[in-house]
Swiss-Prot record:
Catalyzes the conversion of 4-hydroxy-tetrahydrodipicolinate (HTPA) to tetrahydrodipicolinate. The keyword NAD applies. Pfam families: DapB_C, DapB_N. (S)-2,3,4,5-tetrahydrodipicolinate binds at H133, G142, T143. Pathway: Amino-acid biosynthesis; L-lysine biosynthesis via DAP pathway; (S)-tetrahydrodipicolinate from L-aspartate: step 4/4. The gene is dapB. It is found in: Cytoplasm. This is 4-hydroxy-tetrahydrodipicolinate reductase. Keywords: Amino-acid biosynthesis, Cytoplasm, Diaminopimelate biosynthesis, Lysine biosynthesis, NAD, NADP, Oxidoreductase. The lineage of its organism: Bacteria, Bacillati, Actinomycetota, Actinomycetes, Mycobacteriales. Its EC number is 1.17.1.8. NAD(+) binds at G7, A8, R9, G10, K11, V12, G75, T76, T77, A102, P103, N104, F105. The keyword Disulfide bond does not apply.
Amino acid sequence: MRVGVLGARGKVGATMVAAVEAAEDLTFSAGVDAGDDLSLLTESKTEVVIDFTHPDVVMDNLKFVIDNGIHAVVGTTGFTWERIEQVEAWVKAKPGASVLIAPNFAIGAVLSMHFAKQAAKYFESVEIIELHHPHKADAPSGTAARTAKLIAEARKGLPPNPDATSTGLDGARGADVDGIPVHSVRLAGLVAHQEVLFGTQGETLTIRHDSLDRTSFVPGVLLAVRKISGLQGLTVGIEPLLDLS
């Protein structure tokens, strides 16, 4: 399988280039970065692209690869539901290409989201703290937003978080994502980390995941690359590729 990388000279992109080159069953076909022409992908007969670029350019990248029948595995951040709906419309109009967009490709992060969803209905309170390097473009992270959505779905019909706060500085209680408080930390020395804190009478539960370096994303990305040709249309998250039942 011929695999290209968009954002190939970035920190995550360079990690993906090395991973593809090291995989015996994959061929690195093209590395594309800012200033390069996307036609490099078609000229190199790329079959699947890995996109770790920037929210400002990822939609243009996806339009190009979908129009050219190239599958896409996307780890770029900043996907709103409006953007996801737009990508879904594009792939429906061009059924030859499949797209997988994931807020996080680290297997441990995906499992932590799954565990949080399972725990959500058993606790009165829940809050999320996500911690990343200071160069991250979006806040809260896509992983935190996805986690909050999964928790909110699991807590349907339950009372909201108890919170007697009546005065305070704007933002002190975090962002409200589907009724779940989410707190974002940006700090030099961090990579990608998340804590989900649950509380109820007499006990708390903390689910924490840490990506210590960017190679933590490699197994999930390569799994998606190898599976994407068997998927149809748009897939959000790598959960469908894992046996989480």
